[in-house]
């Protein structure tokens, strides 16, 4: 199995017998869960933890708890974007921060804006274009709320995690913060302790390979020549990710055919979440829907030797040519 889509979907094995220790009882001490919360604090530096439904309704709930003016980047995850649109539909004001043609966030749209909370992560979804939160803080004093599933930045004031991406199950999202006046803490019966446990395990075991990207990219260029192109500069994306596009085919065609060879790629969230939609991120960068269907997103967790890299690239080239001939 060659999984190059782990940042979109990375199932882990759950031990339900051990998980019985995370059933909270109001009449006894809950040592295992208390210890787990301490581990979160030691690892990430946040003292408060809560869970929420990782859906548009769940994000709507977070928006309604925030006492202040909110801005959301178009480069964020699908559930957040849908939640923000739902928030707007109820009559609340919200500021949208767009993406530039090169995939970066348009910081200029933050200028002179009265914002209290900014939903902005340290990388853009799908392309994994890196965002400098240090630069962002030159444009706004808003508290930054970030998705830490692919990368965690110490400059984020609040961090949340997508359990579906981290462990493969649609468990609650986990959010970490310090100021209890921002979000209301949950009563014991409403904490999704399994989500908290699975999230931590996934983050503890999360490993990335920083060596494969350049080798893989070089082989792709050699084999595919003029048939490969790029929406973003891969020197500006996370060092364990790669984003490219193939001319004149829909990414889903090559994704489906490679799956039969146990090689798993992604076009982005719209593909991995089963929405059957092309990358919304590429469209937010100013490209049309048809063009966005060409995009392919990879990430590297494991190490691959030269022979394996060549084997994967050869298979991509072979399937690409077959699809072009059939078309």
PLM regions and their residue ranges:
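Pyridoxal 5′-phosphate
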Residues: 1-327
